[in-house]
Amino acid sequence: MSSIPWIDNEFAYRALAHLPKFTQVNNSSTFKLRFRCPVCGDSKTDQNKARGWYYGDNNEGNIHCYNCNYHAPIGIYLKEFEPDLYREYIFEIRKEKGKSRPIEKPKELPKQPEKKIIKSLPSCVRLDKLAEDHPIIKYVKARCIPKDKWKYLWFTTEWPKLVNSIAPGTYKKEISEPRLVIPIYNANGKAESFQGRALKKDAPQKYITIEAYPEATKIYGVERVKDGDVYVLEGPIDSLFIENGIAITGGQLDLEVVPFKDRRVWVLDNEPRHPDTIKRMTKLVDAGERVMFWDKSPWKSKDVNDMIRKEGATPEQIMEYMKNNIAQGLMAKMRLSKYAKI
């Protein structure tokens, strides 16, 4: 259903006004709202950061987070996060459209986006080709990333130049910026996206995902999946430690997009006190998905990588724990009620 700009803006304001750091930006002709992103929680260390934005224009209002890269029209956001407002929103759209019914033109089939692939990563070098004393090698060693996984990771000192080679015009100035580059392949082994992880602590965006075309895959690791359960984690680096591990990039949690429906097991970060994590776990449990719980874990770190590098866990120990702590349906609801601390 096509949207109506003034209705989009009204419901965006109503849906977002309660969020922390909400403000309306009045320095341009475009209707803009700024807020802390409810999808990723924005920054855990800086409560003043607000990287969620709503942009209203003459076509359709959209929400975008510059931290987790979540992007959706306001109608989709309402449907996912504000179902009561969504029903009212649909009613208002239908009521407004019912006032005048233009003569319907024959519907044209929507053009399918051209499925481009990323044939090369200019200005990058693969980690397994670098010398042991290179700074990025020291970085991945410090994170305990296995050496046999280095071939899946790349490094660049010219991130803006790399991005502009795939998405021209993204950066006006191609200044030097080092990032760990993580290519994202489709099931056929063709790269469609890549994620850049900031190496500077003060970088405004820790993770940035770049797509070759609008519908490009943002599911990491699918080209390496074998038989058996598939573990869906929150970050590409965590997935490198897990057999048959894949990862969600871009901050979205769309069950229709994630593959391996009959085999997947969701492994969210160990954050029983984080409202967004518990909200997403609840959504998965209510949808009948298989979910892995950290409630009996001997490790207290937030994610798999920290459990290994900070607490001395091995990938084998974590895999064994995960296999024995999967729940679904009523059992999952019971585990979640005990696990959640909010």
Curated annotation (Swiss-Prot):
Per the UniProt entry, what is one GO biological process?
Answer: DNA replication
A molecular function GO annotation: metal ion binding
KW Phosphoprotein (keyword) present: no
Q: At which positions is Zn(2+) bound?
A: C37, C40, C65, C68
Work out whether the entry's keyword set contains Mitochondrion.
Answer: no
Question: Which UniProt key words apply to this protein?
Answer: DNA replication, Early protein, Metal-binding, Transferase, Viral DNA replication, Zinc
Q: Where is the signal peptide?
A: none
EC number(s) stated in the UniProt entry for this protein: 2.7.7.-
Q: What does this protein do?
A: Synthesizes short RNA primers for the lagging strand DNA replication. The primase synthesizes short RNA primers on the lagging strand that the polymerase elongates using dNTPs. Recognizes two trinucleotide sequences 5'-GTT-3' and 5'-GCT-3' in vitro, but uses only the first as the priming site in vivo.
Record text on subunit structure and interactions: Monomer. Hexamer. Interacts with the DnaB-like replicative helicase; this interaction forms the active primosome complex, which is composed of 6 helicase and 1 primase subunits and expresses full helicase and primase activities. Interacts (via C-terminus) with the single-stranded DNA-binding protein. Part of the replicase complex that includes the DNA polymerase, the polymerase clamp, the clamp loader complex, the single-stranded DNA binding protein, the primase, the DnaB-like replicative helicase and the helicase assembly factor.
| Family note | Belongs to the Tequatrovirus DNA primase family.
What this protein is called in its record is DNA primase
> Which organism is this protein's natural source?
Enterobacteria phage T4
Q: Recall the taxonomic lineage recorded for the source organism.
A: Viruses, Duplodnaviria, Heunggongvirae, Uroviricota, Caudoviricetes
The record's gene field reads 61
